[in-house]
Amino acid sequence: TGKRVMTSSSSPGISLKSEGISYLAGCDLPALIVNVQRGGPGLGGIQPSQSDYMQATRGAGHGDFHLLVLAPASVQEMVNLTFKGFDLAEKYRMPVMLLSDGTMGQMMEPVSLDMGEITQYDKSWALTGTGLKREPNVVNSLYIKPDELEVLNFKRYEKYAQIKENEQM
């Protein structure tokens, strides 16, 4: 429907969601994914950890894609980067990961919830129903013809270069 969407979990749950994250990337769909990392393999613990850094910054699933990753250093920054994450996901039509850890997940502090202006981006990808007024909109992540897939992968890497140039914090 074109609405903003978010999901969250911690390390093992993100691993279980990795196939869906890959599909989001393959369909060029915006989403915010919050990963409150756990330390160690398996279920891990809630101690401070950067154990999912490689998974987050190198794709979080199979295929030729990357996530845009935001890493807050405070609870206020977690709030601010949540708003920014939604905006970046829509701007670049891709999944964005907010990467935190168990310590941050347990912290409490006063925060300001100033969302600011919400930029409206093109949502021609949205599945809003046709109302018998237009052709159906199909969102696809499967491209059987190698030439089509190659073109899409190159477009994706051009997008990553644009992000690298424009979004360094």
Regions picked out by a protein language model, each given a short descriptive name:
Residues 37-39, 62-68, 100-102, 127-131:
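Short C-terminal domain-edge/linker segments immediately following a structured domain
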Residues 34-36, 60-66, 156, 169:
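Gly-rich Lys/Arg/Thr-decorated short loops/hinges at beta-loop-alpha junctions or inter-strand turns
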